[in-house]
Amino acid sequence: MKQPRIIICRHAESLEDVDNDIYNVLNDLEIPLTEKGVQQAHDFGAVLAQLLKDSEYIRFYTSPGVRNVQTLKIVLPKLSDNNNVEVEVEPLIVKQDWGKITVENRPGIEAERYKAGVLRYTFPTGESVASMIGRLTSFKEKIFGIQKDMEHDIVVFSHGFEFRVLLMIIMGWEEELFESFGNLGNCEYRILTMGEGGEYSLNKPLQKHSFPITRLLKES
């Protein structure tokens, strides 16, 4: 019997990835893909179609962010006609709300965030880490429940940081290990496969970055 999988994907390249000035023009969730991102999504659709070619039932979840929804809409037509697909726009996996971010205040906020630790920092006008972890934990429980009852493959279109936090929650990583990993690139993905005992294994580790963890330098 095929073991159910969870495939977590990051959206294709968006204007946010190439121009931070976009925050002076658009709300974060309204930021669209670039032309390069559209092509990335088409290429990724072919990859995902191959991964899912033998999957009878697939459930897709996407963040409400425009860049996530656009990526998914480009991917879906690439799938096999034999795939039975359900799609849900899921607020539980939306990007953490940083509050009022502008090109002027972003560098200072980012510096303070890394100094405090990305899982400890509180945005002055944004969403708390506890709130984000709480909703991602609820999402984990939701998809675990689905795979417990039905042999669905689940595909998640998330954001870079939230992708990593969701993996931390599922895999039980400690904070220091989590902080040692970098975010995945656009249209990168990881596959979690359920074992016979209900545990999940990761097909490929995340790449560790070479930068010191600022929070640990402060604590030493």
Predicted regions and their residues:
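Active-site signature of alpha/beta-hydrolase-fold catalytic machinery across serine-
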Residues: 74, 165-169
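Active-site metal-binding loops of divalent metal-dependent hydrolases
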Residues: 12, 160-161
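Generic enzyme active-site microenvironment
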Residues: 9, 90, 157
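Generic beta-sheet signal
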Residues: 6, 58, 149-160
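Phosphate-handling substructures
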Residues: 15-19, 30-32, 77-138, 206, ...
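Hydrophobic mid-domain F-helix/FG-region of cytochrome P450s
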Residues: 70-71, 161-163
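Acidic, low-complexity terminal tails and accessory targeting/binding regions
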Residues: 1-5, 44, 50, 81, ...
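Active-site-proximal alpha-helix that buttresses catalytic centers in soluble enzyme cores
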Residues: 2-85, 127, 136
